[in-house]
Regions:
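Positively charged n-region of N-terminal signal peptides that target proteins for export
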Residues: 1-4, 24
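Residue-level detector of intrinsically disordered/flexible regions characterized by low predicted structural confidence
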Residues: 4-5, 261
Length: 451
């Protein structure tokens, strides 16, 4: 009996192994046949039937998957117009099969067709770098770079304060008390919303953004905080203009047509300058007898050496950015490391614009302008009538008397068509002066959706 039982056990084991061997050899064929049927149904446009057959095929495959089945599932989602599932499947396949270029292209095309600018902004730069020869991705990238909105705001005047703040005069004048015409200016943030409006004819925001010199409708200047609480005034002096209060407590001021420095109590330093700028990072530029010097607040009274023929002042009213300044001596223009007192590079330029950021700066060669890195290397050959240094990856350039915008690849993203413009703000907003002389907005979609 024991022998019979042992023989039966052996037969059962052999049978089980035989069954497993049979299934292991027939399952791949069954799966391939089922997948082929699903593909045929998809190609014939029977997407629901294709989904049913694919599900059956996947059940034969078990927990494992293949690129072929995942790609078919992706395409069935698109055929069924299930765009959320289609997008998710593309993102998943990019993670699982990073070497398969087609999924990157399909995802970019999906975002482009749906005008999903945030989606494009989140992937295009990386995908162009990863697949530089993919024409579809490159074409969509270029088109997206040129995409912008135009808004007619019709402001009378706009001044650049920083990459997140502008000073605006909305109308030539407004009627005040007794219907007396008044000039009124206010500060707008990068998205165009008012952040400070004291009903004054002039505003000068401090370096740290916590206080403001304001000039009322009678021409009286005072220093106030953001809640309009009085910080300082000087009734003994009639200022014609006041600059930006530095974190060192010093600002440039004009009285009787002469430039001086004042402190946070609005007391005037007697020394007069041919020209000067506001303090930033503790440094300002002062001019005497046609020559310039870089000074700290404690050196304003004592400085006697003026080694530079020029010091470039940027649109914020400063001569220094991230410890660097653009200066000129007898050899030409160069970028100076202020802390070390040494040039950042050996070569010299005929002219350099001021640094607006740590990004490339505009240089002149002959009658044309191009762009150079802060280490002196040429980024773009001189080809424009005029140019401004880069901010936020974009720069204003002038051709045929009109201004447009180029990106970091020197691609003309906004064709020259405006009388003037300010630098590109953090939000992607740019203020441009139209043919009638008023200021409108354009919004660069790529920069707007960057974050």
């Amino acid at each position: 009996m024991k022998k019979i039982f042992s023989v039966l056990i052996i037969i059962l084991i052999i049978g089980a192994w035989g069954t497993l061997f049979y299934r292991s050899n027939t399952l791949p064929q069954e799966y391939s046949n089922a997948l082929a049927k699903a593909k045929t149904a998809y190609e014939e446009g029977y997407y629901l039937e294709a989904q049913k057959l694919l599900t059956e095929a996947q059940s034969l495959q078990g927990a494992s998957s293949s690129y072929e089945s995942d790609a078919l599932q992706r395409d069935i989602y698109l055929g069924l117009n299930k765009k959320n599932q289609y997008e998710s499947s593309l993102q998943k396949m990019i993670r699982q099969y990073p070497e398969m270029e087609e999924n990157y292209e399909l995802l970019v095309k999906l975002y482009d067709e749906n005008q999903d600018y945030k989606g494009l902004s989140g992937c295009l730069e990386d995908y162009v770098t990863l697949w530089p020869k993919n024409q579809v991705i490159r074409q969509i990238d270029e088109a997206y770079s040129k995409l912008y909105q135009y808004r007619e705001t019709g402001y009378y005047d706009v001044k650049y304060i920083s990459s997140s703040l502008i000073d605006v005069q909305m109308m030539e004048f407004e009627l005040g008390n007794g219907d007396v015409p008044e000039v009124r200016r206010e500060l707008l943030n990068a998205e165009g919303f008012t952040v400070f409006d004291a009903g004054t004819q002039a505003i000068s925001v401090s370096e740290d953004g916590n206080s403001y010199f304001i000039c009322d409708q009678e021409g009286k200047w005072t220093l106030v905080d953001s809640s309009l609480n009085l910080i300082a005034r000087n009734d003994e002096v009639s200022f014609e203009d006041i600059g930006r209060l530095g974190t060192n407590g010093v600002a440039m001021a004009v009285l009787n047509g002469e430039k001086h420095y004042i402190n946070e109590r609005m007391s005037v330093n007697d020394r007069v300058w041919e020209d000067c700028c506001d303090f930033s990072e503790g440094i300002a530029a002062v001019k005497k007898n046609g020559h310039w010097a870089l000074v700290r607040a404690g050196e304003v009274t004592s400085v006697e050496e003026f080694p530079y023929l020029d010091v470039a002042i940027n649109d914020e009213g400063y001569c220094i950015k991230n410890g660097l300044a653009v200066v000129k001596d007898e050899s030409g223009y160069y970028v100076l490391n202020v802390e070390s007192g040494k040039p950042s590079f050996e070569n010299r330029f005929e002219e350099l614009k001021a640094l607006n950021s740590g990004q490339p700066i505009a240089y002149r060669k002959g009658q044309k302008w191009g762009f150079a890195y802060t280490n002196g290397e040429i980024m773009t050959e001189a080809m424009y009538e005029d140019a401004r240094s880069y901010v936020n990856g974009y720069a204003a350039v002038k051709q045929n008397g009109l201004w447009g915008i180029v990106d970091k690849n020197n691609l003309m993203v906004v064709e020259p068509q405006f009388q003037d413009m300010i630098d590109v703000l953090d939000s992607g907003y740019v203020y441009v002066r139209n043919q009638e002389g008023y200021w409108d907005q354009i919004i660069l979609e790529r920069l707007k959706n960057r974050k």
